Curated annotation (Swiss-Prot):
Source taxonomy: Bacteria, Pseudomonadati, Myxococcota, Myxococcia, Myxococcales
InterPro entries in UniProt: 4pyrrol_synth_GluRdtase, 4pyrrol_synth_GluRdtase_dimer, 4pyrrol_synth_GluRdtase_N, GluRdtase_CS, GluRdtase_dimer_dom_sf, GluRdtase_N_sf, NAD(P)-bd_dom_sf, Shikm_DH/Glu-tRNA_Rdtase
Protein name: Glutamyl-tRNA reductase 2
Keywords: NADP, Oxidoreductase, Porphyrin biosynthesis
Region annotation Disordered: where it falls in the sequence: 409-446
Enzyme class at the top of the EC tree: oxidoreductase
EC number(s) given by UniProt: 1.2.1.70
Record's subunit section: Homodimer.
Native species: Anaeromyxobacter dehalogenans (strain 2CP-C)
One Pfam family per UniProt: Shikimate_DH
Keyword check for Protease: no
GO terms for biological process, alphabetical: protoporphyrinogen IX biosynthetic process from glutamate
GO MF annotations in UniProt: glutamyl-tRNA reductase activity; NADP binding
Length: 446
């Protein structure tokens, strides 16, 4: 069943699904690009955006088919169906603005999510899945997030999953000086972890990464040491703490490798923190004696205190988000009137042109060029004067959020309302504004 084209969101996050469900539908690299192409090819979908992070996978589509995004999930993992949430229209807009502003994050106020949403939009644009609608929507979301960041102190305290992980390590071990801390992965999460460790006084930071160049660069930034990827097994036997965050789709630390490492450690305990989704550390490692393993879902309990401390700032941030959502909706309503105005003008000019041609045909050759132009100018002047009032009132109504008047005007004048229901053809509104009619009345005859 089809309807009006608008924004639809279907997704799951740390709030609705455990990590073992989220990792089944997580999308990265080529899989994410393929997903965008698949969504764009769905019947009724004009634009698509996918936000996939360690804590959420969300699909946004501009479509007239409410079930398009849901089918995308259920076809990949039937188990995801029980964990999905769905929003549309203004509610979907509000959700994206809250996500970009880190108000829906596990760590409220964290800075990474805005970059991740920007990256998601960049990928969608590069894949030709995002067009004019998502350009307006996402840029407004980014501006909202910037306001939240600059007008509140929502980012105060531990504001990334990596920082939370490092604070957990500090709570477990106390002082970090002298502790051997191994970072497996030198991407964004690894870099954030390294910096947070250095701030807390860690002085034995080891880095291993599949790409030596990236690993060497990160180790140098924090006065640490780089070790080759082939040394991972030996390093598991030496480190007190292992923080894992690679882009690998499978485990890089298995139960078997950890079992062998514990033999070499002679029962010396180890802390494993897995910040990756899909997980990089086999959950079965936690079954081994003296192995203390944590994944991203375990971090939620750690951040509870930090979240409570920022509650007041979160309330201020929510007010900013709400104001921006309403402003975006109001602008959309104003744009909704533009195609109706363009059609109304074209409709009036067609009638005026036909009447001018009929009049000129009746007078035959009695009028010279100047006379014919006078008739055409008179017809155009009548159109302009008749439409001046309705045009002004339509624009005023749209600016005040009245979406009913454009539809009523279309019905009253007997023209098709291309924007009935709100956003159905929002992508073409700018074009209609740029070319609001067929031009001045010109006779097609003599």
């Amino acid at each position: 069943m089809t309807g009006d084209r608008r924004l639809f969101l279907v997704g799951l996050s740390h709030k609705s699904a455990p990590i073992d469900v989220r990792e089944r539908v997580a999308l990265t690299g080529d899989a994410l690009k393929a997903a965008l192409c698949e969504l764009k090819a769905m019947e009724g979908v004009t634009e698509a955006l996918v936000v996939s992070t360690c804590n959420r996978v969300e699909v946004f589509v501009h479509s007239d088919r409410p079930d398009a995004a849901r089918r995308f999930f259920t076809e990949r993992s039937p188990a995801a169906a029980d964990h999905l949430y769905a929003k549309d229209g203004v509610e979907a807009v509000r959700h994206l603005f809250r996500v970009a502003s880190s108000l829906d994050s596990m760590v409220v106020g964290e800075q990474q999510i805005l970059g991740q949403v920007k990256e998601a939009y960049g990928l969608a644009s590069a894949a030709s899945a995002a067009g004019s609608y998502f350009s307006r929507l996402c840029n407004r979301a980014f501006a909202t997030a910037k306001r939240v960041r600059t007008e509140t102190e929502i980012g105060r305290g531990a504001t990334s999953m990596s920082q939370v992980a490092v604070e957990l390590v500090e709570k477990i071990f106390g002082r970090l000086e002298g502790r051997a801390i191994l970072l497996v992965g030198a991407g964004k999460m690894g870099a954030l972890s390294a910096k947070a460790l250095a701030v807390l006084g860690a002085d034995r930071i080891l880095v291993t990464n599949r790409s030596p160049e990236r690993g060497l660069a990160l180790a140098a930034q924090v006065s640490g040491s780089y070790r080759g990827w082939e040394e991972l097994q030996r390093l598991l036997g030496e480190a007190d703490v292992v923080i894992v965050s690679t882009g690998a789709p499978t485990y890089v630390v298995t139960r078997e490798s950890m079992h062998a490492a514990m033999k070499a450690r002679r029962r010396r305990s180890i802390c494993l923190i897995d910040l990756a989704v899909p997980r990089n550390v086999d959950p079965a490692c936690a079954e081994l004696s003296d192995v203390y393993a944590y994944d991203v879902d375990d971090m939620e309990r750690v951040v509870a205190t930090s979240k409570q401390a920022r509650q007041g700032e979160a309330i201020r941030a929510e007010a900013i988000v709400e104001a921006e959502v309403m402003a975006f909706a109001k602008e959309r309503e104003a744009r909704a009137a533009l195609p109706v105005l363009a059609q109304l003008r074209r409709h009036a000019e067609r009638i005026a042109r036909a009447e001018a041609e009929r009049t000129l045909a009746q007078v035959g050759g009695k009028l010279d060029d100047k006379g014919r132009k006078s008739v055409e100018a008179m017809a155009q002047a009548i159109v302009n004067k008749l439409l001046h009032g309705p045009t002004s009132r339509l624009k005023e109504a749209a600016s005040s959020g009245d979406s009913a008047l454009p539809g009523a005007a279309a019905e009253l004048f007997g023209i098709e309302n291309e924007t009935a229901g709100g956003e159905r053809r929002e992508g073409g509104a700018e074009g209609a504004a740029a070319a609001p009619g067929a031009g001045p009345v010109r006779s097609q005859g003599t």
